[in-house]
Amino acid sequence: MSSSSSSGAATGFAVCSDPQKSFSKMFKRTVILLAGPTGSGKTAVSLKLAPLVDGEIISVDSMQVYQGMDIGTAKVSLADRKEVPHHLIDVCHVQESFNAVDFYYHAVQACQDILSRNKVPILVGGTGFYFHTFLSGPPSGPSPDFVLREQLTLEAQERGISALYQELELLDPVYAATITKHDKNKIIRALEIIRKTGSKVSSYAWQSTVNESKEYHCRGWLLSPDPELLRHNILERCDQMLEEGLLDEVQALLAAGIKGNSSASRAIGYREWIEFLDLGSPPDLFEITKQKFITNTWRYTKKQRTWFKRCSLFRELRPMGMTLDDMAKKIAQDYFLCG
């Protein structure tokens, strides 16, 4: 995995709320955030936006960091990456771990590099907790309690990991919305923190120290398409991924050892087909597995929308009647007005 920048990297992000404020002082220190649920079109919009603001894109996707996870993550093509520079894509092998803290230091390092060349960082993605960490600093938390962790691991075996996830949803719905009910390690660690301290995991992340210098100014937009359009996009997206060779990609990842990484192997679009292949690819289960893939993707988009709508930094942009160019121009105009 690529080396991270030092832990002393500058942080501190502020929202620019005054359109009349001169952007001459802040212009090249402003970071654009473009978020949205899976299938909202944020990648396509970002590729139109980058040339308008002389920007480079930083991926905010917890799975696009992995080499070989291309089709199932809708990773931007190599041709598009040649046209618009991208960062935090293909950072590590599927057997390596990569978490929010790793993302934070990589993203800050990328921002500093982009800004040093007088260009604009554009953070694009749908992983809410990574945006959260970028804005507030790396999550802090108590030291591991291995006795409690072992107890929770036994509970997971006895009650099932879904039962522990339901408990987490009740105790810390904000954090629970950022992970899946299959992410055993994160669920157990979250409950370990909650039971040990009585505090929510999400509150630890937001309480991280923010640099008083407010070196960066963040402007956030949330693509928020109509639910019916989003559902249509997801159906098309899942079909397209299968046509492009998702099953072959999963086979290659199994050979590369993806099962050694619980986060990567449980990612939506991969876990369903890993299970299918493990069962010997029975033809009668193909359509059932495909429906699971679609359903799980749709459920995840609902969680994404819930998370982003709770974050006041993002201003909603509804694509109804707008082309990709229209949306990119709208964001660019707002950006130049505020800086």
UniProtKB/Swiss-Prot annotation:
InterPro entries: Dimethylallyltransferase, IPT, P-loop_NTPase. It comes from the Bacteria. The keyword tRNA processing applies. Its EC number is 2.5.1.75. Its cofactor is Mg(2+). It catalyses: adenosine(37) in tRNA + dimethylallyl diphosphate = N(6)-dimethylallyladenosine(37) in tRNA + diphosphate. Substrate binds at residues 38-43. One of its GO terms (biological process) is tRNA modification. Residues 61-64 are annotated as: Interaction with substrate tRNA. The record marks 127, 149 as: Interaction with substrate tRNA. Keywords: ATP-binding, Magnesium, Nucleotide-binding, Transferase, tRNA processing. ATP binds at residues 36-43. It holds the Pfam family IPPT. GO terms for molecular function: ATP binding; tRNA dimethylallyltransferase activity. It is an enzyme of class 2 (transferase). Monomer. Belongs to the IPP transferase family. Catalyzes the transfer of a dimethylallyl group onto the adenine at position 37 in tRNAs that read codons beginning with uridine, leading to the formation of N6-(dimethylallyl)adenosine (i(6)A). This is tRNA dimethylallyltransferase. It comes from Chlamydia trachomatis serovar A (strain ATCC VR-571B / DSM 19440 / HAR-13). The lineage of its organism: Bacteria, Pseudomonadati, Chlamydiota, Chlamydiia, Chlamydiales.
